[in-house]
Design a protein with these regions (language model features):
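Short acidic DE-rich linear segments
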Residues: 104-124
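Charged interaction/catalytic cores of defense and host-pathogen modules
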Residues: 2-102
């Protein structure tokens, strides 16, 4: 793992979280309304980026890559999928951090990059 990986993770998780928050708000009032193609384009772009991190056991859905732009998903569909991606991103992060005297750090060669406490911890 490199510092670029850590930076990419932070950027990617931030984007997925922001989109999830926005679509969750829409879904509360209009869960069954299809998302528009403009928003779906951005969502799919971020999903493609996230898929480069989440491989193997970390991938939320084995056969899912992005939403089909011809069959527009509903707001609630997008919220469901993004919630799974956020959970898998946290699992990936937990597998790539370690603790040292109550502080948590990314497993990066030659550097100590501090991170927040994990929501779950998996020894690797």
């Amino acid at each position: 793992m490199t510092t670029k990986d850590v930076d990419f993770f932070g950027k990617t998780r931030g984007h997925i979280q922001a989109i999830h928050n926005e679509i969750s708000a829409l879904s509360k009032s209009k869960p069954d309304v299809p998302i528009n193609k403009f928003k779906l384009g951005f969502i799919n772009e971020k999903l493609r980026e996230t898929n480069t991190l989440l491989k193997g056991a970390f991938k939320p859905f084995e056969k899912f890559e992005t939403f089909d732009e011809d069959a527009l998903p509903t707001n609630s569909d997008v919220v469901l999928v993004l919630a799974q991606y956020l959970d898998c991103l946290e699992s990936w992060r937990c597998a790539n951090i370690h603790s040292d005297d109550f502080n948590w750090y990314w497993k990066v060669d030659g550097e100590s990059i501090e991170t927040e406490r994990p929501t779950r911890y998996r020894k690797s």
